Amino acid sequence: MDFRIDEFDVFEKGDFMETIRNVEINQLHDFKNHPFKVEINTELCELMKSIEKEGVLVPLLVRTNPYGDGDEVISGHRRKEAAVWAGETKVPIVIRELYDDQAVVAMVDSNLHRENLKPSEKAFAYKMKLDAMKHQGKRLPEASSVDDGEEHSMINSNELLARQVGESVAQIKRYIRLTNLIPK
């Protein structure tokens, strides 16, 4: 059974307009300063074999490349690499219009769940996400519900990031300090 996308579709998802289509892999560019490395390992080889058999089943998340032509990969760097190794020339993508800070948060969030992340990858990812969160606003409501007239306590970006990733604020700060020691 072949699940490849031949046409494209446009739809609304929450606050975003998204387009799904197939594109040439050479029109996709890696996310600027992407902190996660695509390593050739057993998992990537298994993904490559799956793509050879079924194609890319989950579209890559991209945005229009703000630095030139083509599209910038937000999520799916491993799928893109495995597709190249599998001999694919096109992959399905979801194009989402994202500002820089939104793109950073989406890129980091889509990769932090992976097993075997290196401390250096976490360090740069936490730093990038924290910087993006700070650009969006320094103090955030602790509750994400609609204002119901109740008084909400406020938390800063460090505390919110720590809660989101299951680390302490001190541990987040230790990871981020690593970025001063590690060359990019």
What are these model-derived regions, one by one?
Residues 36-38, 44-45, 81-179:
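Amphipathic, charge-rich alpha-helical segments that serve as recognition/docking helices
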